[in-house]
Amino acid sequence: MPRTHAIEDYRNFGIMAHIDAGKTTTTERILYYTGKSHKIGEVHEGAATMDWMAQEQERGITITSAATTCFWRDKRLNIIDTPGHVDFTIEVERSLRVLDGAVCVLDGNQGVEPQTETVWRQADKYDVPRVVFVNKMDKIGADFFKCVADIIDRVAGKPVCLQLPIGAESSFQGVIDLIKMKAIVWSGEALGANFDETEIPADLKDQAVEYRTKLVEACVELDDDAMSAYLDGNEPDEATMRTLVRKAVQLRAFHPVLCGSAFKNKGVQPLLDAVVDYLPSPADRGEIKGIDFKTEEETVRHPSDSDPFSMLAFKIMDDPHVGTITFCRVYSGKVETGANVLNSSRDKKERVGRMLLMHANNREDIKEAFAGDIVALAGLKDTRTGDTLCDPQKAVILEKMEFPEPVIEIAVEPKSKADQEKLGIALSKLAAEDPSFRVSTDQESGQTILKGMGELHLDIKVDILRRTYKVDANIGQPQVAYREKLTRRQEIDYTHKKQTGGTGQFARVKFVVEPNEPGAGFSFESKIVGGAVPKEYIPGVEKGLNSVLGAGVLAGFPVVDVKVELVDGAYHDVDSSALAFEIASRAAFREALQKGGSVLLEPVMKVEVVSPEEYTGSVIGDLNARRGQIQGQDMRGNANVINAMVPLANMFGYVNQLRSFSQGRANFTMQFDHYEEVPRGEADKVIAKYA
């Protein structure tokens, strides 16, 4: 089947926002108007088409980004729905990596919220062009102009209005289109298919002219001909305006702002027009950089079917009907079912079995995919999130994604032998789907440890274990992922000798052990000259060091940011072995950590509390009691926003405490910021508990 749409007619975009800004509802309406779903799913009824995991339908939040294809004005839209909850920012990072543009949805009443800032910064990192949709204009307290001001104040954006609202709250009727200078009014609530273009209401005429002038001035800045015509008194016509706004979005010169109410079916069609008119196609985004698999030189792939095939796997899901499905974006070339491709990130061969085009929860089998497509592949064996699949003859590795380290962990104990087996299978699948979720086994207790980005993140994983995989298990209390770090440079000379008749054991090692830069991790270097320790024993030395890294000397937590140099040693022709050097290295490293003033590090979270003013005193007092350091506060609407750095150890159960003293009116978000040393008194308690 040949290509149905030219690559210039593709729009790969995501919808990003804070939790509850109405992102999934907006997506639902888009799917409705583009003719894909005949009954609109409402999030608060737990029936939204994009939220298809049971956990999402119950909690009314979107956890996994489902990719969906639909059509508008004969353009092909691939929408990726992204979660807005802070524990799932990894999902957002993944989807932004493969998007060409984004729609940022704001809650008309709340403006730019903490998670909007996080997502906006992530979009800046990947240089994603975006338009802004101010949603919920029908809500009490909705304030379009405050939202526009927020974009400047809170995320340093450059908003330029393409629309103004007509009325607000319950009297919100429609929008003024500043390019056409017409009012668009929706009649009734009936799925908003009927709207009329009329003249701008007299009372809004002056405001419309003022904002139209701002829009025109922002546009003509981008084009010398348009600028000189404008200075001669000629405003650009409609087509020129659209071309200039499109150029502005591509260059990120400004962010166009639209408004509406997705729930009340107002403003969605003009938003779709804006996606088509202003967001870039894969061709506009241009070439993508990569590393040549053989030469390791930098190379590029162009978004065209004639270039060698390359695609990036950005999401893995376990589907009850199809098995493992891998969502991929094709960057160049084309691929057919049955093709043999190379996973260049892991140097493994893969075969393309089934290829699916996804609508939120139903799927269509396709035979080939082209540059710009977002498809799901069933049955890949070795591919993980962030891997590149490509033409084996012209192999390339597209840039890697970076994934944050988990900061919170819980122990899981299966209740029976049968559960033990099911748990193993389930956890390996969950870890493959989500790189920010790690699984390990505690060597001493034999418990299985799950690590994640926050309490909600782990809650949902446990829920999936129980429901989807039917694993019955006891779940421990959440624990903080402490770390240990050396503070002083040490030189250690250690000899391991064991003589028990027959072959003995002998190994001598001399190490220089010193603290590494924060975040630099562990590094080992052998500076042996003249064969004082033969090459074949060096792996034994490394194995010994690695065994200590997993469990430090203070309380058995992983050791971070340490640099070890092997500077000297000695061996015996008969009695030395890799095992002897492993034992010597382990003992020497432990001694260095004991003498080198090891300290305990803890994760510190960046916390933002949004609270009505009357509770500010209680919030600050409570954060101080949790060893928090207040970074600052400001007003947002009539609420007070308090920013603080608080150790994760003191944040467990905070959500319930905050709800109780603010009668449920305050809320907070937190995300990992950095590790820092635990104060002496606290450290002693932790060591006593775990050692």
Curated annotation (Swiss-Prot):
InterPro entries per record: EF-G-like_DII, EFG_II, EFG_III, EFG_III/V, EFG_IV, EFG_V, EFG_V-like, G_TR_CS
Domain tr-type G: 8-283
One Gene Ontology CC term in the entry: cytoplasm
Binding site for GTP: 17-24, 81-85, 135-138
Highest taxon listed in the record's lineage: Bacteria
Alphabetized PROSITE patterns for the sequence: G_TR_1 (PS00301), G_TR_2 (PS51722)
Keywords annotated in UniProt: Cytoplasm, Elongation factor, GTP-binding, Nucleotide-binding, Protein biosynthesis
Single biological process term from Gene Ontology: ribosome disassembly
SMART domains for the chain: EFG_C, EFG_IV
Protein family (similarity comment): Belongs to the TRAFAC class translation factor GTPase superfamily. Classic translation factor GTPase family. EF-G/EF-2 subfamily.
Function in brief: Catalyzes the GTP-dependent ribosomal translocation step during translation elongation. During this step, the ribosome changes from the pre-translocational (PRE) to the post-translocational (POST) state as the newly formed A-site-bound peptidyl-tRNA and P-site-bound deacylated tRNA move to the P and E sites, respectively. Catalyzes the coordinated movement of the two tRNA molecules, the mRNA and conformational changes in the ribosome.
HAMAP family with a match to the protein in the record: EF_G_EF_2_B
Protein name: Elongation factor G
Taxonomic lineage: Bacteria, Pseudomonadati, Pseudomonadota, Alphaproteobacteria, Hyphomicrobiales
Gene encoding the protein: fusA
